[in-house]
Amino acid sequence: MPPKKPEPKKEAAKAAPAPAPAPAPAPAPPPEPAKEPTFDPKSIKIDFTADQIEEFKEAFSLFDRTPTGEMKITYGQCGDVLRALGQNPTNAEVLRVLGKPKPEEMNAKMLDFETFLPILQHISRNKEQGTYEDFVEGLRVFDKESNGTVMGAELRHVLATLGEKMTEAEVEQLLAGQEDANGCINYEAFVKHIMSG
């Protein structure tokens, strides 16, 4: 049987040109990130007792560097005063309640006690302090030998480079007397030391 010859393909009937596709709708603008509400000190209800307020005022006055004792502190001192009063806000929280000032405003703008008190109340309500177990668990990650110690050098590096970075001087002050002869730190004793004041 002779091989079949390929049949010539019939040209398909020319279809009418397809209408141009409709232009794609413009992409929707990306959704704006959810804005965190701005802090309004006037909206904060003060729950402190008169004695507590007097104590806070006394501590606040110790930070007052105005020449005439105007009972004002710089924005840059706000976090220090909050921490002196037993609070533990992050730097980001302090900046947020201050209205996110520019770096150059931190030592120029002043804050009086009447403005500071609602900030203190807000921070004290929102504090989520870690427990002893939280801190020990966090340090256990660095316990390579599972022997209850971490290398002092590694802890120094972490404290100075991660999260809310500490200065070298702050790290040295914090770790003073905590290292053994091998440069290791017993982290359970270290956490007890920190939490005791």
Swiss-Prot record:
Gene Ontology terms for molecular function: actin filament binding; actin monomer binding; calcium ion binding
Disulfide bonds: none
Modified residues (N,N-dimethylproline): 2
Record domain EF-hand: where: 56-93, 135-170
A GO biological process held by the record: regulation of the force of heart contraction
Biased composition regions of type Pro residues, renumbered to the chain: 18-32
Gene3D superfamilies: EF-hand
GO CC term, one of those recorded: A band
Subunit structure: Myosin is a hexamer of 2 heavy chains and 4 light chains.
Protein's name in the database: Myosin light chain 4
Organism expressing this protein natively: Sus scrofa (Pig)
Lineage, highest ranks first: Eukaryota, Metazoa, Chordata, Craniata, Vertebrata
